[in-house]
Amino acid sequence: MKKRFLATFVSAVMLATVLTGCGAATQAPAQETAAKEETAETTEVADTQTEEAVPASDDASGDVTIWYYWETAGHQEALDHIIQEFNGQQDKIKVQAKYVPFADFKKQLSVGASAGELPDIVILDNPDHASYAAMGIFADITDRFDVSNYYPGPVNSCTLDGKLYGVPFGSNDLVLFYNEDMLAEAGCEVPKTWDELLDVATKTTKGNVYGFAHCALQNEEGTFNFLPWVWSTGQTSYEINSEGGIKALEFEKSLVDAGAFPKEAINWTQGDTMNQFISGNLAMMINGTWQIPTMRQEVPDLKWNVAPIPQDKQQASGLGGENYAVIAGGNEEAAIAFLKYATSKDTCLYMMDHMGYISSDSTIAKDQFKGDAVYQVFVDEMQYANARGPLPEWPDISDAISLAFNKVITGDSDPASAAAEAQATIDSIIGK
């Protein structure tokens, strides 16, 4: 992008309406280890115009701090790239980013909110968005961003009581990855239903190779991977002690009982699961878009492909990704100006392409991966991707769900009992 254009863009972004804040001055979360301020070499962004958006006021100037939790070097470099480009093309706003480990995110946010020491923008995991919005930490930006072309799931994750408290950064979803050679050797087709998945997983299990796995950690990461089973039955995230919820737990148990699903998966992150798959220890797995760049680089000769997650009654996938949120009472106008730039078409495409994400803007996503059949499966599945929550109490609800499937996988509880226990916790949280 030309220097002259970005300067004009920022000036235009400074021309109009005043942002409506939603609460007291506070600031945003931090994620990943070693809080460090990013400075990286500047690279060049696409030499095309940034899209216009609802302008900010004349007061857009000063420093803007962003908190983020990505620990992957490529993610950090991509964010730094657009920040350095933005800073280098105008002199009214200076943006800097600070990394905080994901494990420390909630603690840092809570402490920062109490002490009045928060940033101006936060990039956060989308299921956590509603809980922070309910605390009054995020600014209401309903009238500042047009999200009519965004996928419903990402927008819902930014919305509370009909108001928009953030903008989707980028999205990802889950699909079935499969080893083509292992399925062919077992004489199996790609499974489309639960029954077919159980059959194929059983037939491809032999020696040290398990037929199927997904991350089953007792935390949000595990819940993310488990919930597509529940949604596929037609139940919601809050209906675990239901016909469909129990059926989902029973299906998980059937995979374990068949010896096709490793109990060790309760200790596996999504990255661990991917490593097991590319090492030849899994025939199939559930995982997301962000693994593709690594897989293509590390195992270029491995024959693998992707397909929709096998279904019960209906197709379902889990919506992942992050959102941007502006901190109420921070440097809101300058934060808005930067986010207008960051969410414009060419800047968004740069970020998505370098991070393996799908744009949350459907008009961008539909052309993002033309010619790439693997990524296109993920794009097609976005219409079936469900957001976790969004409720302010979601983190506690997620804990109850992950405890349930963990107990079933380890054999510490049967599906019906685990579902009843989880439901009792969920009902107490949402006030039923």
Give the predicted meaning of each segment:
Residues 1-65, 88, 363-366, 371-373, ...:
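Short, low-complexity disordered leader/linker segments with a strong preference
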Residues 81, 85-153, 181-192, 283-284, ...:
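Extracytoplasmic "Venus flytrap"/periplasmic binding protein-like
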